[in-house]
Amino acid sequence: MNKIYSLKYSAATGGLIAVSELAKRVSGKTNRKLVATMLSLAVAGTVNAANIDISNVWARDYLDLAQNKGIFQPGATDVTITLKNGDKFSFHNLSIPDFSGAAASGAATAIGGSYSVTVAHNKKNPQAAETQVYAQSSYKVVDRRNSNDFEIQRLNKFVVETVGATPAETNPTTYSDALERYGIVTSDGSKKIIGFRAGSGGTSFINGESKISTNSAYSHDLLSASLFEVTQWDSYGMMIYKNDKTFRNLEIFGDSGSGAYLYDNKLEKWVLVGTTHGIASVNGDQLTWITKYNDKLVSELKDTYSHKINLNGNNVTIKNTDITLHQNNADTTGTQEKITKDKDIVFTNGGNVLFKDNLDFGSGGIIFDEGHEYNINGQGFTFKGAGIDIGKESIVNWNALYSSDDVLHKIGPGTLNVQKKQGANIKIGEGNVILNEEGTFNNIYLASGNGKVILNKDNSLGNDQYAGIFFTKRGGTLDLNGHNQTFTRIAATDDGTTITNSDTTKEAVLAINNEDSYIYHGNINGNIKLTHNINSQDKKTNAKLILDGSVNTKNDVEVSNASLTMQGHATEHAIFRSTANHCSLVFLCGTDWVTVLKETESSYNKKFNSDHKSNNQQTSFDQPDWKTGVFKFDTLHLNNADFSISRNANVEGNISANKSAITIGDKNAYIDNLAGKNITNNGFDFKQTISTNLSIGETKFTGGITAHN
């Protein structure tokens, strides 16, 4: 974060102008008394910048908003929170932005493909944005362009965890034009430019005169949101805003590069308007400078790394650094071009591509345009690069190999039709991936909720306990497409995961055969029969399958020699720290700040019965916000089994029980202490820790019960 060392008055803007350490110094002709006054204000700014005000807002609300947790889901409307004084706060009735584009450090924002934006002065601190983490993937900066401290960065891989923030498509020149494009009518009836920012600087919590320092920066656990009002639209190519007086999260060192969002009234969506540049204090009020999104600069970098080839339905061969375009089958010579490593090859208008060598594109990928079909043949040769980006309604028939020493990143809404066993891992962000061979990929990682894996052959997934498929935040869809599939556990971290069968003529059996307690957080729908059968002569009470997502099928569910629970899901919230406090010598390192924060909010939690807000847990039995799980099926067949319906479950279907026990309205419930964080090891492993306790909520069952023996 740039500290603003000098301010001066601008007749053009009618306000104070910040001059950062990166900008030209204030002119020597400036009145000395004015400069001295502004300097003292700027120095005071470093004191006032100690950031998250929890005097009337729970600390967790700032984190939940930036991390899209709790009530702050992307697109949510009419969101209100209860303040510590009992009042309601409504965020000016704004919808909630999708902050998934924010890197874990908060100092950069993905904008799609292999690109992100930040500020140029972050290069001084490698922790900020030189390596960017999204969920379980790390990306490295390979090139950049900057102007006026705004920086566009090129990464070494296509980012799969997010489609990225939508960049602002226009840059109004005046405040009145900006007010027209981005202004909203606030609760007091006036029209203002109100927005959000998400970042993770050197976080401290302020309660009156008390300050709780975390001694932490760039922590994803502490990614927090600010609510602001733009007060000046153009100040040396930047905009200036001030923070909300109630929901008050002041920017501080480490917040540089974090993204600022405004609602675009024309596009009817949130857009990224710039990145955080610096701060200053004026009359005791902190102001923040945002360097505006520079579309021209972004386009220049993208053009530098794009090599466009119009196939127009023809053939192309690639060998080493040579790419040869054949206008037709009779054209054996073709037209030859040189390709440059680290550039993206952009194919248009459909056609055929033949690899004649092992290809290493470095940080370059292959991009296919919209609405066409492409055939890729490798003749046993391999491709390696940033990934594959397929446009809407395009299909790429992939009859080549991806390098086994790398991970294929697939983005774009189009379809990758994989026709060969790859012997590699894949990470999927968008679109369809069709599997046509047994064990097509070693492991599959689905992120963002926009991708789908379609089985087109029996055993096309892996054969380990997770079947080699892992669903991280917001997950994605697995379409069984008429094929049976067995799991010991499904590695899904939240309800963004859906397992379906789109084949309406052929039932698919989804078998989950866990022999220890396990919670599946996702959804099951379509033409699926769900089974949980343990091969044993005795009932395995430990083999408990807990469903806290949803089931919607017209088919049967079958449980033998095991236990099944259907319940709702305790909504996940942000935590303050995911690792334990390793300091045991209080006299050396002081009291654990997480404990201090909990104690600071304890009186309010006692008043509102809200200990769950400060307990540093993602989920709690006593929290009031449980999602209702809806479970619909034809008949549940129980054989030597236990079945229970716990809190916040709505179950519709008949039950046929043989030597089995049924509990409707079970007082016991289950939570996953790692919910939302289950996926580990670069995306290809799964952990779960389950707790059970008394927790009572509404239960509903509709159907008939037939019991035998």
Spans of features found by a protein language model:
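Terminal peptide-recognition signature
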Residues: 14, 114, 118, 153, ...
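Chymotrypsin/trypsin-fold serine protease catalytic domain
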Residues: 150-250, 254
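Catalytic histidine site
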Residues: 77, 81-138
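C-terminal subregion of chymotrypsin/trypsin-like serine protease catalytic domains
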Residues: 50-81, 106-122, 145, 215-245, ...
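Extracellular, surface-exposed repeat architectures
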Residues: 349-420, 457-550, 614-709
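Solvent-exposed adhesion/ligand-recognition segments of exported proteins
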Residues: 4-30, 44-49, 299-382, 550, ...
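Glycine- and acidic-residue-biased ligand/ion/polar-headgroup-sensing regions
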Residues: 321, 414, 428-436, 449-451, ...
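Acidic/polar low-complexity surface segments
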Residues: 455, 495-497, 566-632
